[in-house]
Amino acid sequence: TPRDALALGGDLWVAVVGGTSVADGVSYRVIPTLFGVFLVMLVRLLLRTTTGFPRSSALFAVPGFLLTSWFLSGASGSHSQWWTGTLGAILIPLIGSIWFAASSYVRDSEAPSMQHWISGGFKMGGLMSLVTVVASAVAALVALVAGWGRASGIHELLGASSMMDTIFIVGGQVLFAPTMMAWAAAWWSGAGFMTATDSLHSPTVVGTGPIPPIPLLGTVPETAPGNWVVFVPVVLGIACGVASARVYRRSHLLHQSAQGVLASVVFVSIVALWMWSATMSMGSVRLAFMGPLVGRSTLYLFVEIALPAMLVPLVTHPTTLALVGQSAGRVRSEGEAMRRRHAERLSREAATAS
């Protein structure tokens, strides 16, 4: 009936903004992250109509989106708790409006000039985030190819009897593509992810418990290759550092340091939000938590990617190299002076003995 369809739409909307639904006393929280990314891009696109207004006016999208989200979920949702989606309903328009304001700032020739290290920090943080996302997409694709047989077997167990059933099942899983990429990033960072509260999967641990009947979970690694996997993000971090040293080089070492710190803050913020959106709750007891451990995964990726990317430009900075050269020269000079004093002392002792 139309009322049932409206109730389903309200529940789905709450899921998109990260809210919780309750059925038979059990809480569920599953975020179709690809749809959330689409909403951010849609907000960014719609804000183009405000080009003639001050850039700060784009922030009015936040209360407008939030109130609309509350109304849709509160008036139509049957199982959802409308207030639980508040955080997502704030973050989606906020990210879109900040994106629009930043891009319009760059295009505005009359805007006051931004400090180069500030703009470089945002660009460097975006570069590190983009590299992490692309590498995670490749890792997720490799896992999908390797586990295709298991995923197909789980799909057959779902009993799809028609083409529409198959399209619905596959399409629903496509909406979780960023989620699977986040799980892949958490895995090769060494932190791992949970397929249940008692089942951790990481390069050194393979969970042994049963998994929910979701075809994508058939791509979960069945072996533990070892900690050597973490060298992949470390290499990516060093590569980002080399690129940043070439593209975002600053003349002052202090500005270079501040740029690296700002880039790390941007990277950590994006990764933490990404990992949080990839967590889910699909039931009670074992399925009360699934996904990456947000704090641990964010910390590991910071150490493996952001930290090398920040240190490489500092180590290779001309000021650093000059300081190292001066220190090395001072050490050599002191060594030569010590050798001369030692030789003089030996000559005096020899003269005294004679």
PLM region descriptions:
Residues P54-H116, V145, A151, I238-S333, ...:
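Alpha-helical transmembrane segments of multi-pass integral membrane proteins
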Residues T1-L39, E156-V232, S277-V303, M310, ...:
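Long, glycine/tryptophan/cysteine-rich extracytoplasmic
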Residues T1-A146, R150-L158, M163-I167, T319-Q326:
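N-terminal membrane-targeting/anchoring modules of bacterial envelope and secretion proteins
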Residues V40-L47, L236-A245:
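Glycine-centered structural positions embedded in regular secondary structure
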Residues R107-S109, A191, V234:
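Short charge-dense sequence patches
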Residues L127-A139, L175-M194, A258-A272:
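Hydrophobic alpha-helical membrane-insertion segments
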